Amino acid sequence: MYAIIKCGGKQYKVSEGDILDIDYTGKAAKETLEITDVLAINNGELKTGAAVANAKVEAVVVLDGTGVNRAKKVIIYKKRRRKDSKLKRGFRRSFTKVRITKIAA
């Protein structure tokens, strides 16, 4: 059984026991997170739309995103030719690591 969920503007294909990195939620470790934005569920047959309107996915936070869980730095470099103008910026995304515990249809 798997489900396709939408969390933080991204879509993930998850099943029970999966561990994934989602955008920072502000939840502490071992707190429960309920995701109600379910796009599809496959339990032998694929259900989408109104059939999954009351479906939800429960997850538990493995590690919170404060300080430790930061993604690799992405460098943004902009150069304007012939203008002697350049800009270099870095960005590190904070994320929360969760484990999917239950998929309820």
Curated annotation (Swiss-Prot):
InterPro entries: bL21-like, bL21-like_sf, Ribosomal_bL21, Ribosomal_bL21_CS. SUPFAM superfamilies: L21p-like. Keywords: Ribonucleoprotein, Ribosomal protein, RNA-binding, rRNA-binding. GO terms for cellular component: cytoplasm; ribonucleoprotein complex; ribosome. It comes from the Bacteria. GO terms for biological process: translation. One of its GO terms (molecular function) is structural constituent of ribosome. The keyword Iron does not apply. This protein binds to 23S rRNA in the presence of protein L20. Belongs to the bacterial ribosomal protein bL21 family. Part of the 50S ribosomal subunit. Contacts protein L20. PANTHER family: 50S RIBOSOMAL PROTEIN L21 (PTHR21349), LARGE RIBOSOMAL SUBUNIT PROTEIN BL21M (PTHR21349:SF0). This is Large ribosomal subunit protein bL21. It comes from Aliarcobacter butzleri (strain RM4018) (Arcobacter butzleri). The lineage of its organism: Bacteria, Pseudomonadati, Campylobacterota, Epsilonproteobacteria, Campylobacterales. The gene is rplU.
